[in-house]
Structure formats: structure tokens, C-alpha cells
Amino acid sequence: MNDRIIDFDPLIEGVLIKRYKRFLADIELESGEVVTAHCANTGPMKGLLSEGAKVRISFSPSPKRKLPFTWEQICVFNAKNEEVWVGINTLFANKLIKKVIEKNLLIEKIGEIETIKSEVPYGKDKKSRIDFFLTPKSSNPDKRNIFIEVKNTTWIKENVALFPDTVTKRGQKHLMELKELIPESKSVLALCITRKDACFFAPGDDADPLYGSLFRESLSAGMITIPCSFEFHKDHVSWRGIKPLK
């Protein structure tokens, strides 16, 4: 399975000089020019930050932006010494998950969908926002509304994609809130795996043991986990299917 699901203008290629202050990366373009790009991924990016690695960036010359360049992808070598392009722009994850929902690629997990809303307040105090709130079609046997939380996943060990790659209090809170929605609603954790070499998904216990424990508790309570795999190219992203849990 390798379905092209999102197209975009060809990205600009270069080489990573360094990433610093979490939000910034200096990149040398093929012309020799060095530019500073915005890095939307503020995490440690385990296994990705190799200086001299090939990268791809986008260009948006809006006067409202401080930096016209955004770091989108990096090329790494996996355990088989194969080149793998990894999507590192965390802001792109929701766009990908929304696209596969709209294309009915998750129908086996969530059924047919009537409406999709983004950033809907939820939880006891309504101070949290769920990435996607879905209502099912009237023909669905399960009439429950669906709450989907999206997590961008770039870390891999051998062929297992892992999340998180560091301690995430926010992620822990999201799992507890998803668990509280069950059984009145469907709670879904959608992992956006932004590299083609993952065959399985598991929680990143080594990075955040509490997250792993909460993940398994939520799973036992009825949370649905959907590890969504994608392959990144210079001008598009392809769908590689749903991966099993390890």
C-alpha cells in the first residue's frame, strides 16, 4: 500500500548545520547559502539530529512570518542502513490524520463519519481541546461520538515506532482525559508515524515510563489506538496503512 494522499510544492533541499534554541535550525542550501529555518518540533527528536544530514525545507514569504523557511523533513539511516525521510513538522500531523479520516482510510477503526470538527473544548473543565471531534453517520451501529487525539511519532527502535521520546506531562494528561470519556464516547489515540520503516507501534517506556503505564490503562479501558504510517517525499506524502501494536 502506497497511496499518495497529500501533494505540495517541491521542497528545497539542503544540509543540516545545527539545530538550536529548540525552534531554530541552520541549513546550508545546495547553492551554498545558509538560511535559518523554523523548527516546529520542540522535542529532543531522538535519533534524528545528525549534523550534515540531508534535509528539506519549505518557503513561505509571508510578511507575518519571522522566518520564511520551515524545516519539514530529515533523511536518516535505519537499522538496515537504508535512507529514510522523516517528517519532523509536528504541525503537519493533524493535516495528515484529517486527510485519512476524510478518505475513509480509518473506517475499520472508527466507522463512517458524518462531521469533523477541530480543536473542540472537552474534559471536566473544558480547558483542554481535542484535535478532532467526530460524529458518526446515522447508519453506524455505534452511535457514540468520537474524540481523536493526534501524536506525531518520529522515534524508532529497530522497526518499532515509539511515542513519546521524552517525558510529556501534557501527553500523560491527554491519556487520562481520553480514558475519562469512555464508555459514553469513543476515545482514539492516532499516532502519526512520519517514516516508512516502522512495522509496529509501542509506547516509549524508556523515555516516559508513566506515559507507558497510562497508555496501557487507557487501552484496557477501551481506548482505540490507531498507528497511522506515512512515507514522505519531496513533493507529496503517501499512506502506508495502519500498523499493529507491539
Swiss-Prot record:
GO MF, any single term: DNA binding
Pfam families attached to this UniProt entry: SfsA (PF03749), SfsA_N (PF17746)
InterPro entries per record: SfsA (IPR005224), SfsA_C (IPR040452), SfsA_N (IPR041465)
Transmembrane segments: none
HAMAP family with a match to the protein in the record: SfsA
The family this protein is said to belong to: Belongs to the SfsA family.
The protein's name in its UniProt record: Sugar fermentation stimulation protein homolog
Organism: Prochlorococcus marinus (strain AS9601)
